[in-house]
Swiss-Prot record:
Keywords associated with the record: DNA-binding, Nucleus, Transcription, Transcription regulation
Tissue: Strong expression in female inflorescences (ears), but also weak expression in male inflorescences (tassels). At early stages of the development of the female spiklet, expressed in all organ primordia but later restricted to the ovule and the developing silk. At very late stages of development, expression becomes restricted to parts of the silk.
CDD domains per UniProt: MADS_MEF2_like (cd00265)
Main localisation: nucleus
Gene3D superfamilies per UniProt: Transcription factor, MADS-box
UniProt keyword annotation of Kinase present: no
SUPFAM superfamilies noted in UniProt: SRF-like
InterPro entries hit by this protein: MADS-box/MEF2_TF (IPR050142), MEF2-like_N (IPR033896), TF_Kbox (IPR002487), TF_MADSbox (IPR002100), TF_MADSbox_sf (IPR036879)
Role played: Probable transcription factor.
Domain K-box: 85-175
Organism encoding this protein: Zea mays
Gene Ontology terms for molecular function: DNA-binding transcription factor activity, RNA polymerase II-specific; protein dimerization activity; RNA polymerase II cis-regulatory region sequence-specific DNA binding
Gene: M17
One Gene Ontology cellular component: nucleus
Protein's recorded name: MADS-box protein ZMM17
Length: 259
């Protein structure tokens, strides 16, 4: 049973279409090579795929350029030569005209060139300017609101810092006052120590360390009731031997002692 005839139409499946292109291209180039070799013909083939990739074949006896020149000579056709200088001149002229139009539009927007405008043109220009001004004002208000928000945030930050510093200062002041109160409470304790002259006189009177220790304790216990300025009062002794003013130790540096 022979092969069925394939319908010649575009293959919808891209994979099948690519596979068929590769097979048919290989077969075509093979047939072109056989024709050139067997018949000594000048054959040239140029193929572009659907993706734009180029494939070419030329018979071994010549090059593809030679075949194209031979084709042009045989058909009396020539490719149009491109004049690059003229193209550049045309492009420069076009750009110059465009720049003149832009400059004219700018002068009209600034109000410098309105003499050539009609009433309708002036009305259109006025509407365009009003629309532009409204957009500029909207952008201005947006920027002002952003700046105000930034200033409010900075103000809040400064207030928080100020509150924190104020609290720290108050805490330091309270701590300093507490320290002063504690020092004030400890100050009277220093007054409990007897004056050096007083303690020395008591020790000398009782004639020894053993007897002076008790007397010194009694004097120290009585010290809070005495003021430093009241040490000049005269104390009278209660012992008979101390009541005699002629006694050898009748007083302590001119003062009597009453126990």
């Amino acid at each position: 049973m022979g092969r069925g005839k394939i319908e010649i139409k575009r293959i919808e499946n891209s994979t099948n279409r690519q596979v068929t292109f590769s097979k048919r291209r290989g077969g075509l180039l093979k047939k072109a090579n056989e024709l050139a070799v067997l018949c000594d013909a000048r054959v040239g083939v140029v193929i572009f795929s659907s993706t734009g990739k180029m494939f070419e074949y030329c018979s071994p006896a010549c090059s593809l350029r030679e075949l194209i020149e031979q084709y042009q000579h045989a058909t009396n056709s020539h490719f149009e030569e491109i004049n690059h200088d003229q193209q550049i001149l045309l492009e420069m002229t076009r750009m110059k005209n465009e720049m003149e139009k832009l400059e004219t539009g700018i002068r009209r927007y600034t109000g410098d060139d309105l003499s050539s405008l009609t009433l309708d043109d002036v009305s259109d220009l006025e509407q365009q300017l009003e629309y532009s001004v409204s957009k500029v004002r909207a952008r201005k208000h947006q920027l002002l609101n952003q700046q105000l928000d930034n200033l409010r945030r900075k103000e809040q930050i400064l207030e928080d810092q100020n509150t924190f510093l104020y609290r720290m200062i108050n805490e330091n002041q309270q701590a300093a006052l507490t320290g002063e109160v504690k020092l004030g409470e400890m100050a009277p304790l220093a007054m409990l120590q007897p004056p050096p002259a007083f303690a020395h006189s008591a020790t000398a009177y009782y004639g020894g360390e053993s007897s002076s220790s008790g007397t010194a304790l009694q004097l120290m216990s009585a010290a809070p009731q005495l003021h430093a300025d009241d040490l000049g009062f005269r104390l009278q002794p209660t012992q008979p031997n101390l009541q005699d003013p002629a006694a050898p130790c009748g007083g302590l540096h001119g003062h009597g002692l009453q126990l």
